[in-house]
């Protein structure tokens, strides 16, 4: 019943969000095209509920990489000024309202991570896939990208184990000042978010 209520809220929020922000979506699309070139909407395969992959939609915030200049360490040089501003204000996330409408993500939950991370989690970190990934979550109101991986994943597991509707409402409310204050957008060295290390000790991922 609670999950059904969450889904109803997601659909209403997505539909209302797409309607209200349609002029902003158009303006952001034009600005992205002028600053980053072709491919206004960036599609990346992410891990969803139970580890099932889906395509997350975002506005492109970086120029296409030059040969040999790919990876998080080159984020700063590829980031456009428009993209930097949109990422700081989370406007690059607006296209993900379509993912919300389709039920691939929810308003509150662990952030969806790239599919190639599946083998890199340790032990109970896989509990984060027991719920749909979210637009915002416990880690996002406690440091966002500035939080290191072990702490960030611990926040995700804590959320899954303790989530309530009241807790979701608190996270949504606290997301507003976190976004407006543009806190935790990048890590200390200027990288948006370092890769989750591939050599973490583990017993192996569960079967999807």
Task: Enumerate the language-model features and the residues they cover.
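A hydrophobic, helix-centered structural microdomain
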Residues: 1-65, 99, 171-208
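Positions in alpha-helical segments
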Residues: 14, 42, 80-84, 116, ...
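Short, hydrophobic secondary-structure boundary micro-motifs
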Residues: 28, 43, 70-71, 108-110, ...
């Amino acid at each position: 019943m609670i999950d059904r209520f969450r889904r109803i809220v997601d659909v209403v929020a997505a539909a209302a969000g797409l309607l209200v922000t349609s002029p902003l979506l158009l303006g952001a699309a034009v600005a992205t095209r002028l600053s980053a070139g072709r491919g206004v909407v960036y599609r990346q395969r992410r891990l969803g509920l139970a580890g099932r992959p889906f395509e997350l939609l975002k506005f492109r915030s970086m120029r296409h990489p030059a040969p040999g200049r790919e990876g998080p360490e080159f984020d700063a040089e590829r980031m456009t000024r428009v993209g930097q501003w949109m990422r700081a204000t989370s406007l690059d996330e607006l296209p993900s309202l379509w993912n919300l409408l389709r039920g691939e993500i929810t308003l509150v939950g662990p952030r969806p991570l790239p599919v190639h991370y599946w083998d890199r989690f340790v032990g109970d970190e896989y509990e984060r896939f027991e719920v749909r990934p979210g637009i915002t979550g416990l880690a996002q109101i406690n440091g966002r990208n500035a939080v290191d991986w072990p702490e960030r994943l611990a926040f995700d597991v804590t959320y899954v184990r303790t989530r309530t509707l009241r807790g979701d409402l608190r996270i949504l409310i606290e997301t507003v000042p976190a976004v407006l204050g543009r806190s935790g957008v990048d890590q200390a060295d200027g990288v948006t978010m370092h890769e989750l290390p591939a050599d973490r000790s583990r017993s192996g991922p569960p079967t999807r």
